Regions:
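N-terminal leader/linker segments that initiate helical-solenoid repeat arrays
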Residues: 9, 14-119, 124
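Amphipathic alpha-helical repeat scaffolds of TPR domains
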Residues: 56-76, 101-123, 149-169, 194-210, ...
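Canonical positions in the second alpha-helix
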Residues: 95, 137, 144, 188, ...
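Terminal, low-structured helical/coil segments at or just beyond the last alpha-helical repeat
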Residues: 237-278
Length: 278
């Protein structure tokens, strides 16, 4: 997998950041060979303040902490230096520790923040530091499960960093823990069939690897299309970016370069500095 983590309406007529050519306002047609489904739009940005799709910030969390969370998230996607990301995260975690929010919400926020820092270190090729932060994210998610049980939110919060660790650590860890990522996503979907984060975890597991490692690019695109149909109220910026890049990657793996380029350009409208989408 490739890792694949301020509220304005998406303007479909923005100039593509890669070549400054005006992007067509609607996605290119999905070829019949890929499936009968179509992408009618690139999706919208949510107007709500959410930690994850459909999960708002806890009421006791003060506005400066919410603002700092979004700054941290966006800096990760803008490929800021991991040292600056880590410093910002440490400061934010300290800020959150004294705010009147539940232990479960503390654990959720710690898991998400730690995941973002791990992602930043991983993007900058520091495997050791990435592992440290992904492990912290897993520990926080496990604490969340201990406090509230295996809720869909807790399961996807655990599955995402565990998936990263399964790639970064040794083969034994992958064999033991890799299958759990899909299992946790499936379990989340059992009680919440429209859980967007769980669906995206499923789609990513199909969009990025080669077929020998479970890649199924047509199925991935079908899941991504279903997410867009569910997310009528929009998605957080990072989630929408990951979705667009996932669609682009699946099309790229199918050698459909026109479709892939359109979706990469759509992703760059959200984070023009992101190196993967360029």
């Amino acid at each position: 997998l490739i890792n694949i983590s301020a509220f304005v309406t998406v303007n479909n007529m923005l100039y593509a950041q890669t070549n400054y050519v005006l992007r067509e306002p609607s996605p290119p047609q999905n070829p019949a060979s890929v499936g009968k489904f179509q992408f009618s739009s690139p999706g919208l940005l949510s107007q709500s303040q959410e930690i994850l799709p459909g999960i708002p910030f806890p009421k006791g969390m003060m506005l400066p902490a919410v603002t700092t969370f979004f700054e941290l998230r966006d800096n990760v996607y803008k490929s800021a230096t991991p040292e600056s990301i880590e410093a910002q995260a440490v400061s934010l975690l300290k800020m959150l520790s004294i705010q009147p929010i539940s232990g479960s919400n503390q654990a959720l926020l710690e898991a998400r923040i730690s995941y973002l820092v791990g992602r930043s270190w991983n993007d900058h090729k520091d495997k050791k530091k990435a592992i440290t932060w992904f492990e912290r994210a897993v520990e926080a998610a496990q604490k969340m499960i201990g406090l509230e049980g295996e809720t869909p939110t807790a399961l996807v919060t655990l599955a995402e960093p565990l998936g990263e660790l399964s790639i970064l650590k040794d083969l034994g860890f992958l064999i033991k823990n890799g299958p759990k990522v899909g299992q946790y996503a499936s379990k989340a979907l059992e009680s919440d069939p429209k859980n967007i984060k769980a669906l995206l975890l499923k789609a990513s597991a199909l969009a990025y690897p080669p077929p020998i490692w479970g890649g199924d690019y047509k199925k991935a695109l079908e899941i991504y299309a279903s997410v867009l149909s569910i997310a009528q109220n929009g998605l957080p910026r990072d989630v929408l970016f990951d979705l667009r890049v996932g669609i682009a990657t699946a099309y790229s793996n199918l050698k459909l370069s026109e479709n892939a380029a359109w979706w990469f350009d759509a992703a760059l409208e959200l984070y023009p500095e992101n190196p993967y989408a360029k």
